[in-house]
Amino acid sequence: MTQTTRVVAGIASVAAGTALAIWSTRDLREAKRTRAPGKHVAAARAFNHGSALLALSVLADSAMEHYRGSFENRAMYLPPVVALCSLGAALHGGADQRAASHRLRHAIQICGAATGATGTAFHLYNVTKRPGGLSWHNLFYGAPAGAPFALVLSGVLGAIAEQLRDEPEHDPQLFGMPAGKALALVAGAGLLGTAAEAALLHFRGSFQHPAMYAPVTIVPVGGALLAHAALAPARHAARASAFARLWLRLTAALGFAGLGFHANGVARAQGGWRNWSQNLFAGPPLPAPPSFSALALAGLAALRMRETER
């Protein structure tokens, strides 16, 4: 495959995902005007929205990074394609107010989670096969071990949203526990995982800017508070949920602020945005920070549902 073809394929993947997101906005606005059948469907749609944001992040990130790797392994074409399918399924689910799962959407999201898990295994293998094996140097400069985890999370959020739609409106259950509690634990674990990846990459960057400490402090605290709110006894539930909700809003804002910081990092490189074709690959990854926002918004939906379980 020629370099021109690779460029066209990468740009087409990102453009298709962006166009799909814009096209779906009309349906999402119309859906908000209509009362949802139940809070469990509203929570499912919120998880679909979080899944969509994560899938868009993976689509852009994997297309860029695998292009930078010249698609050396043909399996490197799979993540952008699967992420695009997951994005479409998540956006469709976000606009769907029916209290019933969609088989195709569910299958796509399960496929996305499986692809992300397989990608994580491939990336870990890439790290360990290098001279020195599992070392800090290889974790810093080998295939990013945590990157495919975002696709796992996108698929998991989307699949859980489909499963939740099949539950009864009153007292829905997931994994043998109240649905709100289960959703909060899943979102909290996702926040902790993404914070760990940010910690590794920001440590590699020597925390050159004070703002680089924000994702490794605010985000894990948000994940811990969300888990605490899910597990808190009834007498402490209201206070725990209120504080967790406030912190998750801060985390959601941090994700979009991080996008701005990363864009500024690209602009500060030699040539700035005029040299975008080089600096986008050499600078901080633009698609990474919104994953915090996606999981924080999912966590807020879980807390709203958790309130009905008291």
Regions found by a protein language model. Give the residues of each.
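Short amphipathic, positively biased membrane-proximal segments
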Residues: 1-310
